[in-house]
Regions:
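Short alpha-helical "recognition helix" segments of helix-turn-helix
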Residues: 126-127
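Acidic, proline/glycine-rich intrinsically disordered inter-domain spacer in sigma factors
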Residues: 5, 9, 77-103
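C-terminal flanking helix
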Residues: 15, 19, 40, 106, ...
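A short pre-motif secondary-structure segment
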Residues: 112-116
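Structural recognition of an alpha-helix C-terminal capping motif at a helix-to-coil junction
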Residues: 34-41, 45, 54-66, 139
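A short, charge-rich alpha-helical start-of-domain segment used by transcription regulators
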Residues: 1-20, 44, 110-111
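DNA-recognition helix of helix-turn-helix
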Residues: 65, 69, 130-159
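Arg/Lys-rich amphipathic alpha helix in sigma70-family domain 2
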Residues: 51-52, 61-82, 91
């Protein structure tokens, strides 16, 4: 029977990749560090119930993404009926648009883009996490990036 490693070892082994994901979504600074801390706090609470042999890194990255989204939403400005004359767009608007674009992709596209572009895994290693083959995963990522670019261009044309 396999058991999961001690949680301290999990933090040491996966802490860097979780911080990289948080920083990619929130930018460097205290928000990314808060998301990292909240990720491992939530993971510590849920760790005893995690199935033995589960993909711990993928599980942690999912938690980190949710925590980053929570922080972005908490920092999102409240809509007003009328904007003041000197209204300035918040610096995170682009990040929220990026998250919306990511959310519109298929689950496979989101995961492949995350593993390859955010965590730095080569396409040859990603089938170990997601199944499939490197060529199909590369295609899924390319299609996802193309869709995100298209959405970005449409948003620019509207503004």
């Amino acid at each position: 029977m396999t058991t999961n490693p001690a949680f301290e070892l999990v933090v040491r082994r996966h802490g860097t990749s979780v911080l990289r994901m948080c920083t990619a979504l929130l930018g460097p600074g205290p928000d990314a560090q808060d998301a990292w801390s909240e990720t491992f706090l939530a993971a510590l609470r849920a760790y005893p119930a995690l199935a033995a042999g589960a993909n711990i890194e993928a599980w942690l990255i999912t938690i980190a993404r949710h925590k980053a989204i929570d922080i972005l939403r908490a920092n999102h400005p409240v809509p007003m009926d009328e904007l003041p004359e000197s209204a300035v767009l918040p610096e995170r608007t682009g990040q929220l648009e990026m998250l919306d674009s990511l959310a519109s992709l298929s689950e496979l596209q989101r995961k492949v883009i995350g593993y390859h572009y955010l965590l730095g895994f080569p396409y040859a290693d990603i089938p170990a996490f997601l199944g499939g083959n490197p060529a199909s995963l590369r295609r899924a990522a390319a299609d996802g990036i193309k869709a995100m670019r298209s959405q970005h261009h449409e948003a620019e044309e509207e503004s």
